[in-house]
Amino acid sequence: NPDEIVARSLFLWSENPDTQLLASIEGGTIFEITVADGAKGVNKTVREVSGVKDMLYIAIRRGGKLIIPTGDVVIMPDDVITVFTKEEAEGRSVEYMDELFR
């Protein structure tokens, strides 16, 4: 039901205000989150915080520079992480990122 999908999506994003929806594309979503100082995921590598199936780190902005995230890149406070997730993993991905980085 399309109305349920819209309602579920609105609820998800309202419950996670520190996570910004950048784009919805057919079958997936691109969003970003700014890493809080003291968050669980700080000082961990992308490999260590890649715990959700069907989610991919696509960019990290740090101090005005763009980083293409490989497994060895270490997450730092104030990094802005951009993620792509398949539609069916959107809720899981947003919750996971909020838990790690907020």
Model segments located where?
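Phosphate-binding glycine-rich loops and their immediate beta-loop-alpha structural context
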Residues: 102
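Flexible, Lys/Arg-rich cytosolic regulatory linkers and terminal tails that connect or flank
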Residues: 1-41
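Cytosolic Rossmann-like ligand/nucleotide-binding regulatory domains
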Residues: 35-97
